[in-house]
C-alpha cells in the first residue's frame, strides 16, 4: 500500500522510438500506450460500467475536476467514499486539474497570480480556483493520478503571452506541490501529482518548461497545451 508510481519500459522497437511500458500504482497496473476513456462527470457516456470493465477492459479512465466540482460537487463524492465508490470503478482514475475547462468553457474568467475566477457554464455562479484549492478538491475527489493546476494558453497565441503564461504555470506548480506535500490522501491509497509542461508551439519555451519541471523530480510529467487548435505539423 501507498507505494509511489513506478514506470518501466517493457519492450522497445529497434527501428523507431516506439515502446511499450507499465505504470504501477497502488490501485494496479496500467499498460502503455493506453486508451483512456473520458468520464468527464465520472461516468463514461453511452457505456455501462460492466462494459467498461469486461468488454473495453479499461485499465484507467479520466475524470474532470472542473465538471465534478460544479456537478455533482465534491461533498457528494466525499460522502460516497471517493470517486471510485461513487462511480463503482475499482481501477485507476486520473483527474485533470480543470485548468483547460476554465479557459475554454467558462465566461468572464479573470486570471491573476492568485488563481482564476470564473463563472459556471451551468448556472453562471462565480467560483475561484487556486493551485491550493484545486489540490484540495482533487484530494477529496480521490483520483489516483491528479494533475497540477496550469494555464493552458489558446492557439494561436503570441510568444510574449505564452512565455508569461508558462512562467505562471511554473509558479503555480510550486504552490501545488507545497499543498500536495502538506496534505494526506483521504481514502487509504497513494495519489500521484503530475505537473504539466507548457510553452505553446514555441520550441525554446517548451524546452525551458520541460527543464524547469524535471527539476521538481515528480514520478511522471505531462505534456500540456496540445490539441487546442494548432496544426498537426
What are these regions (language model features)?
Residues 188-190:
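Short gly/pro-enriched beta-turn/loop segments at secondary-structure junctions
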Residues 3-186:
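Non-catalytic, usually N-terminal nucleic-acid engagement modules in DNA/RNA processing proteins
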Residues 179, 183, 192-233:
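Glycine-rich phosphate/ribose-binding loops and adjacent secondary-structure elements
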Amino acid at each position: 500500500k501507498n507505494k509511489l508510481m513506478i514506470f518501466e519500459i517493457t519492450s522497445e522497437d529497434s527501428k523507431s522510438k516506439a515502446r511499450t511500458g507499465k505504470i504501477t500504482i497502488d490501485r494496479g497496473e496500467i499498460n502503455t500506450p493506453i486508451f483512456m476513456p473520458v468520464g468527464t462527470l465520472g461516468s463514461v457516456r453511452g457505456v455501462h460500467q460492466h462494459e467498461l470493465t469486461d468488454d473495453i477492459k479499461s485499465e484507467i479512465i479520466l475524470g474532470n475536476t472542473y465538471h465534478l466540482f460544479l456537478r455533482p460537487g465534491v461533498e457528494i463524492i466525499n460522502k460516497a467514499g471517493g470517486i471510485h465508490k461513487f462511480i463503482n470503478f475499482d481501477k485507476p482514475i486520473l483527474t485533470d486539474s480543470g485548468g483547460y475547462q476554465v479557459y475554454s468553457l467558462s465566461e468572464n474568467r479573470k486570471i491573476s497570480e492568485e488563481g482564476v475566477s470564473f463563472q459556471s457554464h451551468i448556472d453562471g455562479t462565480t467560483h475561484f480556483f487556486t493551485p491550493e484549492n484545486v489540490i484540495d478538491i482533487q484530494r477529496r475527489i480521490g483520483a489516483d493520478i491528479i494533475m497540477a493546476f496550469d494555464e493552458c494558453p489558446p492557439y494561436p497565441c503570441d510568444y510574449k503571452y505564452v512565455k508569461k503564461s508558462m512562467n505562471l504555470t511554473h509558479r503555480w506548480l510550486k504552490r501545488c506541490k507545497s499543498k500536495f506535500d502538506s496534505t494526506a490522501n483521504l481514502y487509504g491509497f497513494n495519489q500521484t501529482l503530475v505537473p504539466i509542461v507548457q510553452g505553446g508551439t514555441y520550441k525554446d519555451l517548451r524546452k525551458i518548461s520541460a527543464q524547469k519541471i524535471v527539476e521538481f523530480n515528480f514520478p511522471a510529467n505531462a505534456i500540456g497545451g496540445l490539441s487546442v487548435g494548432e496544426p498537426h505539423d
